[in-house]
């Protein structure tokens, strides 16, 4: 099993698909990485030679931010926006949609489950 960027890649899938298991690599970047590393995209992960795995690993390390580094950069960017106190930072802080979506209805994913109304307990019957 090939291990690249701290991720075990599935053995039976094509390397083009296997690379997408790494956080930060999608279809397009997987194709570019394989093109730069001079590896055929239809090769199964189990059929890769040690030299091909090394070339893929080096290409990713040199050209692409993946896994922990990418997650750290994204979280620092969000934290920076919140520290600035700009509109986007405030939206992040409040847990609301950041990119201009409506919130009167929808936005449930970002806002979380509905908070139900808390009703008052029924008043006791007046004593006669």
Curated annotation (Swiss-Prot):
CC per GO annotation: cytosol; small ribosomal subunit
UniProt-annotated stretches for the region Disordered: 95-128
Pfam families with a match to the protein in the record: Ribosomal_S13 (PF00416)
GO biological process, alphabetically ordered: translation
GO molecular function: rRNA binding; structural constituent of ribosome; tRNA binding
Superkingdom of this protein's organism: Bacteria
Keyword annotations of the record: Ribonucleoprotein, Ribosomal protein, RNA-binding, rRNA-binding, tRNA-binding
Assigned protein family: Belongs to the universal ribosomal protein uS13 family.
HAMAP family, per the entry: Ribosomal_uS13
Role: Located at the top of the head of the 30S subunit, it contacts several helices of the 16S rRNA. In the 70S ribosome it contacts the 23S rRNA (bridge B1a) and protein L5 of the 50S subunit (bridge B1b), connecting the 2 subunits; these bridges are implicated in subunit movement. Contacts the tRNAs in the A and P-sites.
Quaternary structure and interacting proteins, as annotated: Part of the 30S ribosomal subunit. Forms a loose heterodimer with protein S19. Forms two bridges to the 50S subunit in the 70S ribosome.
Designated name of the protein: Small ribosomal subunit protein uS13
Organism encoding this protein: Anaeromyxobacter dehalogenans (strain 2CP-1 / ATCC BAA-258)
Record gene name: rpsM
């Amino acid at each position: 099993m090939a291990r690249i960027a701290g991720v075990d890649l599935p053995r039976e899938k094509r390397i083009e698909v296997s690379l997408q298991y790494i956080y930060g690599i999608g279809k397009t970047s997987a194709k570019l990485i394989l093109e730069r590393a001079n590896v055929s995209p239809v090769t199964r992960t189990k059929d890769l030679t040690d030299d091909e795995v090394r070339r893929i690993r080096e290409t990713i390390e040199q050209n692409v931010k993946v896994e922990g580094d990418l997650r750290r950069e994204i979280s620092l960017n969000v934290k920076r926006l919140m520290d600035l106190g700009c509109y986007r930072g405030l939206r992040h802080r409040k847990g609301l949609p950041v990119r201009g979506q409506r919130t009167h209805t929808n936005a449930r994913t970002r806002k979380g489950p509905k908070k139900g109304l808390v009703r008052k307990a029924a008043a006791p019957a007046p004593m006669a």
